[in-house]
Regions:
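Flexible loop/hinge segments at secondary-structure junctions
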Residues: 1-165
């Protein structure tokens, strides 16, 4: 396997959502049923995440993500949920573009996707491993390793060891 690129997992909300960012425990609490990263009780409304703007405190949270056949799903489960289990009410989609489209179409939506997709209609949230030291998924933060949810992508070559490429 040869590393050829870097991908980042991003968390997106509808573009009208006033949420400023999330830390690892909040992300775990939103998406996980087991909360192995230390997330508190699962938030049911945006008010549970301290959104106090008019009209947001009582709004329910609608969750979107990738299906289990996806490497993005596995990476999210490993890194964002500390290998915990996803909630059953996370809508599963076959591609990151579909997740982004679902979040863009739901005022209450939150989802995770690969950063490499067109992110129209959504807001990308800065994320933090600790409390609120949020880091945006800029190209520089991803490349430098500062952004906490980045990973290398590999190309695999199937050839006999004693044969040239």
């Amino acid at each position: 396997a040869v590393p050829v690129a870097i991908d980042a997992l991003v968390v997106v909300v509808n573009q009208d959502n006033p949420l400023a960012g999330l830390n690892a425990r909040q992300l775990d609490a939103i998406f996980s049923v087991t909360r192995l990263c230390g997330g508190a009780l699962s938030p049911h409304s945006w008010g549970d995440l301290q959104l106090t703007q008019p009209g947001w405190a009582q709004r329910g949270i609608q969750r979107f993500g990738r299906n289990s056949a996806s490497g993005t799903w596995g990476f999210f489960k490993q890194q964002a949920l500390c290998n915990g289990d996803l909630r059953r009410d996370v809508g599963e989609y076959p591609g990151s573009a579909a997740v982004v489209q679902a979040v863009a179409g739901s005022l209450n939506g939150i989802g995770y996707a690969s950063a490499g997709f067109h992110l129209s209609g959504v807001k990308v949230l800065p994320l933090a491993r600790d409390e609120n030291n949020w880091i945006s998924p800029t190209a520089e933060n991803i490349r430098s390793g500062r952004y906490p949810y980045a990973r290398p992508l590999y190309i695999y070559v199937n050839k006999a060891p004693d044969k040239p490429l």
